[in-house]
Curated annotation (Swiss-Prot):
Protein name as annotated: Shikimate dehydrogenase (NADP(+))
Record function comment: Involved in the biosynthesis of the chorismate, which leads to the biosynthesis of aromatic amino acids. Catalyzes the reversible NADPH linked reduction of 3-dehydroshikimate (DHSA) to yield shikimate (SA).
Catalytic activity: shikimate + NADP(+) = 3-dehydroshikimate + NADPH + H(+)
Biological process terms in GO annotation: amino acid biosynthetic process; aromatic amino acid family biosynthetic process; chorismate biosynthetic process; shikimate metabolic process
Active site per the UniProt annotation: K69
NADP found in the keyword field: yes
Quaternary structure and partners: Homodimer.
Species of the source: Vibrio parahaemolyticus serotype O3:K6 (strain RIMD 2210633)
Entries under HAMAP family matching the protein: Shikimate_DH_AroE
SUPFAM superfamilies assigned: Aminoacid dehydrogenase-like, N-terminal domain, NAD(P)-binding Rossmann-fold domains
Keyword annotations from UniProtKB, A to Z: Amino-acid biosynthesis, Aromatic amino acid biosynthesis, NADP, Oxidoreductase
InterPro entries: Aminoacid_DH-like_N_sf, NAD(P)-bd_dom_sf, SDH_C, Shikimate_DH, Shikimate_DH-bd_N, Shikimate_DH_fam, Shikm_DH/Glu-tRNA_Rdtase
Source lineage: Bacteria, Pseudomonadati, Pseudomonadota, Gammaproteobacteria, Vibrionales
Pathway where this protein functions: Metabolic intermediate biosynthesis; chorismate biosynthesis; chorismate from D-erythrose 4-phosphate and phosphoenolpyruvate: step 4/7
């Protein structure tokens, strides 16, 4: 009898654009793991039913992307500390006892990518633009790297304040209104999706210190709108979120399979795939 191949998937809506099947197929090949990984479009409001069916049918684990990360948080029967702090889940795994554990690997993916680029996080002055789920998922992993300060700014200031209050117990976090942020930072992270529509956050260009790094969580063929602007205004280095995508995927793969794939080679392949489209 042929042993059943372990099944994994990514759930989202829309999901056609997802790079996750490409990434995990390469991870499996690289680590000699026998598995399948598919993209599944769940109806809005129907994620929990879709996830239940997936696991009941033998699914081993899945990634979760927009708009279902909060639903996945509710669905999990157990949560890791980083998932609890993020208030959202991007990785689910079925344990041997049948429980479903929820994790959030986004922050680990971001930190891995920054370190891969030799960005020094310890002692850095970090600015995060945006206070939504994407920002919330990365604050604790960034604070674990011991920056001098982490400032959150957002169009709706009260949201930035809420996040600063939530995470202040873990390190030096403050919230600042967008129109008064004018000091220099070493690392400026855009967690908003503004670049997707070619827009810029309403922030002063004076935030870029000498030798500063700009990081946009969005990605595309060339420089994102935000990174183009950052380079024009003094950022010495600019990176997009493709490496974070591969990093969070590697962390998910590690949770599922107990093996950490090499992200660097896969990122090269993915970049080539993206540029060729």
């Amino acid at each position: 009898m042929t042993p059943q191949i372990d099944r994994y998937a990514v759930f989202g809506n829309p999901i056609g654009h997802s790079k996750s099947p490409f990434i995990h197929t390469l991870f499996a090949r690289q680590t000699n793991q026998s598995l399948t990984y598919t993209a599944e479009c769940a109806p809005v409001g129907g994620f929990i039913e879709a996830a239940k069916a997936f696991f009941a049918d033998g699914g081993k684990g899945c990634n979760v992307t927009l708009p279902f990360k909060e639903d996945a948080y509710q669905f999990a029967s157990r949560l890791t500390e980083r998932a609890q702090l993020a208030g959202a889940v991007n990785t689910l795994k079925k344990l041997d006892d049948g429980e479903i554990i929820g994790d959030n690997t986004d922050g680990a993916g971001l930190v891995q990518d920054l370190l891969q680029h030799q960005v020094v996080l310890e002692g850095a002055r970090i600015l995060i633009i945006g206070a939504g789920g994407a920002a919330r998922g990365v604050i604790k992993p960034l604070l674990d790297q011991k920056p001098t300060s982490l400032t959150i700014t957002n169009r709706t200031f009260s949201k930035a304040e809420e996040l600063a209050e939530l995470f202040s117990v873990y390190g030096p976090v403050t919230a600042k209104e967008m129109n008064i942020v004018a000091e220099e930072f070493d690392i400026i992270i855009n967690s908003t999706s503004a670049s997707l529509s070619g827009e810029l956050p309403a922030i002063s260009s004076s935030v870029f210190a000498a030798n500063s790094t700009s990081y946009d969580m969005m990605y595309g063929k060339g420089d994102t709108t935000f990174n183009q602007w950052a380079k024009q205004h003094g950022a010495a280095h600019a990176y997009d979120g493709l490496g974070m995508l591969v990093g969070q995927a590697a962390e998910s793969f590690m949770l599922w399979r107990g093996l950490r794939p090499g992200a660097k080679q896969i990122l090269r392949e993915l970049r080539k795939n993206l540029e060729g489209q």
